[in-house]
Regions:
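Hydrophobic pocket-lining residues within nucleotide cofactor-binding pockets
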Residues: 2-6, 133, 175
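Generic structural signal for alpha-helix termini and adjacent loop/cap motifs
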Residues: 20, 78, 159-162
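A short, exposed helix-loop element centered on a Lys and neighboring polar residues
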Residues: 68-69, 112
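Short, flexible, mixed-charge acidic loops at enzyme active sites
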Residues: 39-46, 183-188
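C-terminal helical subdomain
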Residues: 62, 120, 127-128, 140-199
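The beta1-alpha1 cofactor-binding region of Rossmann-like NAD(H)/NADP(H)-dependent oxidoreductases
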Residues: 1-13, 51
Length: 199
């Protein structure tokens, strides 16, 4: 496993990937401590939570920034590449807690600002909002499996010119309609937490 808190280890990892694969074509920034930092503070106001809760959430933004900074030069040199920040509707409306929302808003802004600085290079940066997940630790009714977001990223990567989408917030359900894919279950997620629901 890679310790994203170790900057040198991250650099070594990226260089190893470049050496083995030649270059990085797609980067998906999805590292987040998740329920481990969110669940213990559910129902508590921001002023009732330890300050460390904010840092635990915001570490995801630093990791995304660091990985993007390391792979972007190769993408720019190749005049091709896609950076995807996995975010959430929590970046646009209140969901779970203040630190959760601030972190996802920052992930969205990171994609938007990177896209501005990448304009004209052939490299796109987007923010992707999956819906409520069905995983080994969560199960929103009629939610999305992780494969659904994976298929959204694959569809984007295969689409070619993404200049019109770069800097935007994209929703897995909307991309499924646009590119014609379904979830691993064979269904189109329709739960109340489906990406974009209520936004």
């Amino acid at each position: 496993t890679l310790d994203l808190k170790d900057d040198e280890a991250v650099k070594v990892f990226v260089e190893k990937v470049k050496a083995e694969a030649g270059r990085v074509d797609v980067l998906v920034n999805s590292a987040y401590q998740g329920l481990a930092v969110t669940k213990p503070q559910l129902g508590k106001k921001f002023y009732e939570q330890p300050l460390s809760t904010y840092d635990d959430h915001m570490s995801a933004v630093r990791w995304a920034y660091a990985m993007s900074q390391l792979v972007a030069p190769g993408m720019v040199e190749a005049k091709s590449g896609l950076i995807v920040n996995i975010s959430s509707a929590g970046g646009g409306l209140y969901l779970f807690s203040t630190p959760y929302g601030v972190m996802h808003s920052a992930m969205d802004r990171l994609a938007a600002d990177m896209a501005t600085e990448l304009k004209g290079t052939g490299v796109a940066a987007v923010s992707l909002w999956p819906g409520g997940a069905v995983t080994e630790s969560t199960a929103f009714p009629d939610g999305e499996t992780p494969a659904f977001a994976g298929r959204a990223v694959a569809a984007l990567a295969a689409a070619g010119d993404l200049a019109a989408k770069s800097g935007k917030i994209l929703m897995t359900s909307e991309l499924a309609t646009e590119y014609g894919f379904v979830d691993a279950t064979g269904a189109m997620p329709v739960g109340s937490m489906a990406s974009g629901a209520g936004v």
